[in-house]
C-alpha cells in the first residue's frame, strides 16, 4: 500500500499553526496573486526559508480552497427551543444560497436543541466562515460548529 493512502487530514484553526506554516500560506497566496513574483522574492518578503516553503507548500491549503469542487459541509447549530426556530434557520440557509442535503433536529431538553445540517454551497460565493458567522447572527442561535466537510 502506498504511503499516500495512509495520510490523515485534520481541520485545525490558524492560530495554533506554527509560524512557518502560516508564512507558507502567505507566500503561496502572494505567488498566486502576482505571477511576476519569484519564489525567492516571495519567501524573502515574508521572512521564510525556501526549505520551509518547499517542505509545507504541498501540504497546507485553506479549507475553502480544498472544497471548491464539492463545497459540501456539515454544521451543528445549538439553539434555544422556540416556535419557528427551524424555519428561521432554513430561511437563512435559503438566503445564503445554500442547499440542504440532510437535516436533523434533536428533541429539546431544558429548552435547548441542536440542528445538524449537511449543506451544499455550490451556488454560493460565501466561505464557510462567512456562512457560520451569518448563522450565528440568527436570534436564539447560541453556537455554530463545523463538524465535517467533503474534500
From Swiss-Prot:
Residues annotated as domain ACT: 74-149
InterPro entries: ACT-like_dom_sf, ACT_dom, UPF0735_ACT_dom-cont
PROSITE patterns in alphabetical order: ACT (PS51671)
NCBIfam families noted in UniProt: PRK04435.1 (NF003361)
HAMAP family in alphabetical order: UPF0735
Family, per entry: Belongs to the UPF0735 family.
Protein known as: UPF0735 ACT domain-containing protein SERP1207
The organism of origin for this protein: Staphylococcus epidermidis (strain ATCC 35984 / DSM 28319 / BCRC 17069 / CCUG 31568 / BM 3577 / RP62A)
Taxonomic path: Bacteria, Bacillati, Bacillota, Bacilli, Bacillales
